[in-house]
Every structure is written in structure tokens, then in C-alpha cells.
Regions:
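GHKL-family ATPase ATP-binding module
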Residues: 2-51, 64, 88, 96-98, ...
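C-terminal interaction appendages of subunits in large macromolecular complexes
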Residues: 3-6, 452-471, 486-491, 502, ...
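Mature N-terminal segment immediately following signal peptide/propeptide cleavage
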Residues: 52-70
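Short conserved segment of the HATPase_c
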Residues: 68, 125-148
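Conserved short strand/loop->alpha-helix "switch" segment adjacent to the catalytic nucleotide/phosphoryl-transfer site
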Residues: 69-87
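Conserved, non-catalytic sequence blocks in retroelement Pol enzymes and Pol-derived host proteins
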Residues: 77, 128-133, 353, 384, ...
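Residues immediately C-terminal
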Residues: 96-97, 124-125, 572-573
Length: 712
């Protein structure tokens, strides 16, 4: 799923950070920046280093204290993403039990007071005393970081957790945790208040005949840590549906016991369609695993399959400690949707398993096409982009010792994964082609059509470039470039309309800020072929300005700006234009998003012109009302008649206003776009850019209240 994260400070006009700020306040501010991943510990050491540094200055953070001081290091953030991550930590433990073959059903409940309960039918956390610890296994995993079965020799062969911190981190960031274990014939219970057990683990009632073993964890997130403690049903639902797809046969249930406060829930079969109604339980179980997943994704894309059935196969190598499941189906769509996972973790940056898949697929299709005479000697080989056009695929590998790397630790690095997946693809898909020659021919014919479109688009681009002899360095006419050639400090503002573009050009910092005005709405790349897309002057201008190319040939090292900022009006039309731009980046320049180079500017809706003191820019009607009430409560006043200025569009702002509100790094708000779950993001883009109005309406209605962190 794609999220936008606030990265630039919210500063009122004229405000300054005084030099006299106390050391204590500086430390507090620095700690908050660490939690929000804006400052590393090393930078903190450099910026706040005392003049004297002795042993007495050293501080060792014991146990869960470190988690509470820097929660962002353990769960990513203290915003909604981090809050939901707490639930995933507990559920991941239950999934580990399922992967080990001991659990078959996980039940998650959102309680009326926004507590969370997770119940599984696994083996139950060990209740015996842990040697050397002097306390039970339950208390050990609740209070010690990196304590659990995944750190020993024989607890789990495969584990889904990246960090393995799990339940102890949930305890660290909760006001209360209730735990119940069904094991060794009894119910065992323990309660934790503010991270500490209220009593030792208690042996309770005997288990009844036929009652399964397992673990129940109920927790309440700490409102002093998190910006919000209100869970989003759809976020959890989407995640658990994906978990069910990736763990064949595992049943996952989600129940929301809160009263629903608004109409319009997009979940089919979920009864929360009227205010006051309670969410019903949704349950997911897929006996065909990722084969069902691909079938589901194809239906979401509303694309027509090229072959009738989803192609799927699986393999295992006990010696290497790796297994793989692969499922795929070609469709009439123009973009590919290949999603990869390692130990059920979404590897949004790809990795060695995806490299093996791509290499084998391209090689196999070309070899088969030549062997069957479909490709002639004079024909050039089909590219990877050609072969994968319209392909929906899921690759899921499970490894004993996964190695994650990349920008966000979501890129698989195990070399054995590449060779294994490549071998499996070559053997299994080769056999499928031999057994289904008619379907194989259709797949290859589609790739040949994609190749022709690609070559036609390339020729059109070359013709355009030959005509554009007056363009400097081949850059688009409309681009007003910046003076700096250092990509790390350069920003490209992609601006809706010539009027706003003119204001942006006047108001910008010409040293580091480039402006590219785009006239009207760009082509919907979700539903356009490559040659049609590349015939669009608007899209060609954007791709040329960015500098990295597109598709399989995209080269992140050639990108000319490390901030690509989409700047559109703060209304529905502006949101649509921003989404069209994001679709282009997601489908054809995705490494830009993965690298953290894509942003959305947040122009204000209102300016409150106080008679005394700095003016305030606000971004929603609700924020206007709140800031207005707070200001009046503090004795502030607005001039009559013109105290509240509403901005109807970027083009209505003067260049000074555009600079002050939307472009000045000291005052602006930017949302950084990043992909947490590529498959969910793919589903969202397909829905937003598709033909059906109703799912889009429901999505917007449900997310209207969450515009500050809405899925892009």
C-alpha cells in the first residue's frame, strides 16, 4: 500500500527558533525527530555532543526502556503505520506457528475501546521457567527484546518477523497487556501494566476436553506514544487477507466490535453500511494460496486473461533451506503487476528472487518462440518489458536465513534465491508451455505486439528529438530548470496548469528548484498502451525532465532531481491530477518511489490573517475551525470581512503566496510517497484509475477523514 508521510516542518509565518532555546528543549526536540526518523542517532551525537565526555556520561538503555524512548527504530513511526504495526507483530508470531505447522486459525478483534485481541490455536508460549532467567517463558518474551523461538536453534525453521522483537515491543508501547496461554492442560494468565507484570504467571482452570492449545494476547496502545490509538478496519483487513493468500489454508478472521460512525464501507459482505451498525466478522482462507491471489488481483484489475487458468507451481530444496511458490497469469492490460514476498514479508524493492524470475521468464519465452518459429532470425529478442506486459504474478519464497537489504530493508539479498527461482521457473514453466502450446503462442504473440509498440514509441521519440534542435540538452521547452547540477539538492515541481506554473517560476528558488508546468490532465497510464503513452507530449516531457528513463530501462542513478514534487490544486480535480501523476510513477518509474524521491505538495485551503502575530495557513475545514477557536480562546482577533482567505486554486495565488505556503522549505508541507505493500498499492491504483465509479466513490468516502495520511 502506498502512503504519504509528512516530511517538511509546519511553521507559521514569521516564526523563528530562538537561539536561547534551552538544552533540555533541544534534546526533547531531537528525540522527537529521532522517533519520526528525521534524525539518526549519529547526527544527534554530533549535534548535541557535550564538551566533556566521561564514563559517567554513558547511559545503557535497559530492556523495554529503549523501545519507549525511540519507538520509531522498532516499529517505523508513532503515527498510524506504527500503531498498526503493533497488531502485525502479534499476528506475525501466530503466523510463525502456522508456518511451523502448529496453527490453523488466527482471530483478531478490535475491541469497543480500541484494544486489540489476537487469538491463535498454536502450541502456546512456553510457561516453564527459562534457564538462567528465573521467570517463565511468557514473562521472558514479554520483557526481553530478541527473546523467542526464532532466536534459538529449533523453534522455527522459517520466521516471518524482520526484527524478531514481536510481543516485547508491543508490551513496551502499551499501557496494558493481558496474556492467556492454553498449554500443558491448563489456562495460564498474566497481566502487564505499564510494561511490568502485576503478578507472576498464574496457573488457572484446566483445559476442557477437545479445547485447543494456543495463545491469546490483548493490548491497549499507549496514547502518550502514538499520535492516534484508533485502528483503521480496512488497513487491517487488507493486510490479513494478504496473509491468508500467502499461507495456504490458514484461516484469519477479523472482527470490529466498535460502533461504526459513518456509512459506506467498501468491504463486500461487511455489514457496516449504516451509522450505528457494528462491523461483522470477515474471514479469509484460501486453499489454493497464491494461485487464488493472482486470480483475485486479475479480477481487481478488470483485465481479460490471455490464458484461461492461473499458472502455478511450487518447489522446495531442503539442502538449500528454501521453498518457492509461483503463480502468474497474462492479461490484456498494458502494465505488469509482479509482487514478491520472502517469508510472507512484502519485498517492495524486489531482490534476488525477482531477478531469478525475470531472467528465467525472458530467456524461456525467447527460446521457446525461436524453437517454434514464432520469432524469425531477423527479429530481435523480446525484452523483459515485452514479455511481462499485462502479466500479474506473485512470487513467494520461504528461507531459513533471509537476508534483507535496500532502502527500506524490503529487498531480498540471498544469492541462492536467484538460482533456485530461476531453475524452478525454467523447468516448470517450460513444461507448462510444452503442455499448452496454444496458450503459450498467445502469450508470445502478446509479447510481440508489446515489442512492436515499444519500437514504435522509440522511433516516435527519436523523431521528436530530431525536430527539437532548439531545446537545450534535449530538455522540454516548458521546463524551467534550476542552476544546480547536484541531484541531491535539486527539486522538480510538476505543476498543474500554465497559470500556476508561471507563479511557481516567479516564486521559486532558481538555484535548486525546477518547474515543469503540465497542461491539463495527463494520460491515464493505467489504461493506455506504451506507444500511445509515449506519443503524449506531456508524459514525454515529464519522463525526459526526470532523466532516468522508464520501465525496465529506468536508471535511478540518472535521475536529475532527488525530489520530484507533484503540485496540484487542493480540491477534487487536483487530487485526480495528482493520482494520474502518481500512477505514471508507480507503473513506469517505480524506483523513484522506492528511493523516496516522489512527494506531493500540500497547498493550504485557508489563510487566517490575525490582526497581531503571525498568520496561520490551514489545510482543511476542520483545521480552520480548530485553529480559529484556539486563536480566539487565546485572545487573538481577525479583521472584519477579510480575516479568512480561501485559496480556490494554485493559479489564484500570487507568486509570493505560492512560495510562502507551498514551495518554501521552511514553511511548506510535503508528503513523501512510499510503498508499504506493492500488491495493495497495485489494487488501489487499479481501482482509482479503472472504469467503475462505485468502488472509487466508496474508497474516497471511507478515506475522506484520513486525508492527512491517505493511501495514494
Amino acid at each position: 500500500m502506498t502512503f504519504m508521510t509528512e516530511v517538511d516542518p509546519v511553521v507559521t509565518e514569521g516564526s523563528l527558533l530562538a537561539d536561547e532555546t534551552s538544552k533540555e528543549e533541544q534534546l526533547k526536540a531531537a528525540a522527537e525527530r529521532i522517533n519520526n526518523a528525521e534524525l539518526t542517532e549519529g547526527e544527534l551525537d554530533e549535534s548535541m555532543a557535550p564538551e566533556h565526555y566521561e564514563a559517567s556520561d554513558l547511559r545503557v538503555l535497559e530492556g523495554l526502556e529503549a523501545v519507549r524512548i525511540r519507538p520509531g527504530m522498532y516499529i517505523g513511526s508513532t503515527g498510524p503505520r506504527g500503531l498498526h504495526h503493533l497488531v502485525y507483530e502479534i499476528v506475525d508470531n501466530s503466523v510463525d506457528e502456522a508456518l511451523a505447522g502448529y496453527a490453523s486459525h488466527i482471530e483478531v478483534t478490535i475491541l469497543p475501546d480500541n484494544g486489540i485481541r489476537v487469538v491463535d490455536d498454536g502450541r502456546g508460549i512456553p510457561v516453564d521457567e527459562v534457564p538462567g532467567e528465573g521467570v517463565s517463558g511468557v514473562e521472558t518474551v514479554m520483557t526481553k527484546l530478541h527473546a523467542g523461538g526464532k532466536f534459538g536453534g529449533g523453534g522455527y525453521a522459517v520466521s516471518g518477523g524482520l526484527h524478531g522483537v514481536g510481543i516485547s515491543v508491543v508490551n513496551a508501547l502499551s499501557t496494558r497487556v493481558d496474556i492467556e496461554v492454553r498449554r500443558q492442560g491448563f489456562h495460564w494468565t498474566q497481566t502487564y501494566i505499564d510494561q511490568h507484570p502485576t503478578a507472576p504467571l498464574k496457573q488457572g482452570e484446566p483445559m476442557t476436553e477437545g479445547e485447543s492449545t494456543g495463545t491469546s494476547v490483548t493490548f491497549w496502545a499507549d496514547p502518550k506514544i502514538f499520535e492516534t490509538t484508533i485502528y483503521d478496519f480496512e488497513t487491517l483487513r487488507s493486510r490479513f487477507q494478504q496473509m491468508a493468500f500467502l499461507n495456504k489454508g490458514l484461516k484469519i478472521s477479523l472482527t470490529d466490535e466498535r460502533e461504526n460512525d459513518q456509512a459506506g464501507d467498501e468491504v463486500a459482505g461487511d455489514a457496516a453500511d449504516e451509522p450505528g451498525a457494528k462491523h461483522q466478522t470477515v474471514t479469509y482462507q484460501y486453499l489454493n494460496g497464491i494461485k487464488d491471489y493472482v486470480d483475485y488481483l486479475v479480477k481487481v484489475r478488470k483485465a481479460t486473461p490471455v490464458e484461461e487458468d492461473v499458472i502455478s507451481f511450487e518447489a522446495e530444496d531442503l539442502k538449500l533451506g528454501i521453498s518457492a511458490e509461483l503463480a502468474m497469469q497474462w492479461t490484456t492490460a498494458y502494465s505488469e503487476a509482479v509482487h514478491t514476498f520472502a517469508n510472507t514479508i512484502s519485498t517492495t524493492e524486489g531482490g534476488t528472487h525477482e531477478e531469478g524470475f525475470r531472467a528465467a521468464l525472458t530467456s524461456l519465452v525467447n527460446r521457446y518462440a525461436r524453437d517454434k518459429g514464432i520469432l524469425k532470425d531477423k527479429d530481435e529478442n523480446l525484452s523483459g518489458d515485452d514479455v511481462r506486459e499485462g502479466l500479474t504474478a506473485v512470487i513467494s519464497v520461504k528461507l531459513t536465513n533471509p537476508q534483507f537489504e535496500g532502502q527500506t530493508k524490503t529487498k531480498l539479498g540471498n544469492s541462492e534465491a536467484k538460482t533456485f527461482v530461476q531453475r524452478v521457473m525454467t523447468d516448470k514453466l517450460g513444461d507448462w508451455f510444452d503442455a499448452h502450446p496454444a496458450e503459450a503462442k498467445n502469450i508470445i504473440q502478446k509479447a510481440i505486439e508489446a515489442s512492436r509498440a515499444r519500437l514504435a514509441a522509440k522511433k516516435a521519440r527519436e523523431n521528436t528529438r530530431r525536430k527539437s534542435i532548439f531545446e537545450s540538452a534535449g530538455m522540454p521547452d516548458k521546463l524551467k530548470d534550476c542552476q544546480s547540477s547536484n541531484p541531491e539538492e535539486c527539486e522538480l515541481f510538476i505543476v498543474e496548469g500554465d497559470s500556476a506554473g508561471g507563479s511557481a517560476i516567479q516564486g521559486r528558488n532558481p538555484i535548486t528548484q525546477a518547474i515543469l508546468p503540465l497542461r491539463g490532465k495527463i494520460l491515464n497510464t493505467e489504461r493506455a498502451s506504451l506507444d500511445r503513452m509515449m506519443k503524449s507530449d506531456t508524459i514525454e516531457s515529464l519522463i525526459t525532465a526526470v532523466g532516468g528513463g522508464y520501465g525496465e530501462d529506468f536508471d535511478i542513478s540518472k535521475v536529475r532531481y532527488h525530489k520530484g514534487i507533484i503540485m496540484a490544486d487542493a480540491d477534487v480535480d487536483g487530487a485526480h491530477i495528482a493520482t494520474l501523476n502518481l500512477t505514471l510513477f508507480f507503473r513506469y518509474m517505480r524506483p523513484m518511489i522506492t528511493a523516496g524521491y516522489v512527494y506531493v505538495a500540500m497547498p493550504p485551503l485557508y489563510r487566517l490573517k490575525w490582526t497581531k502575530g503571525p498568520h496561520d495557513f490551514v489545510y482543511t475545514d476542520a483545521e480552520r475551525d480548530r485553529v480559529l477557536a484556539e486563536g480566539k480562546a487565546n485572545g487573538r482577533q481577525l479583521p472584519k470581512g477579510e480575516g479568512i482567505q480561501r485559496y480556490k486554486g494554485l493559479g489564484e495565488m500570487s507568486y509570493q503566496e505560492l512560495w510562502e505556503t507551498t514551495m518554501d522549505p521552511e514553511h511548506r508541507i510535503l508528503k513523501q510517497v512510499h510503498i508499504e505493500d506493492a500488491a495493495a498499492a497495485d489494487e488501489t491504483f487499479s481501482m482509482l484509475m479503472g472504469d467503475e465509479v462505485e468502488p472509487r466513490r466508496l474508497f474516497i468516502q471511507r478515506n475522506a477523514k484520513n486525508v492527512r495520511w491517505i493511501d495514494a
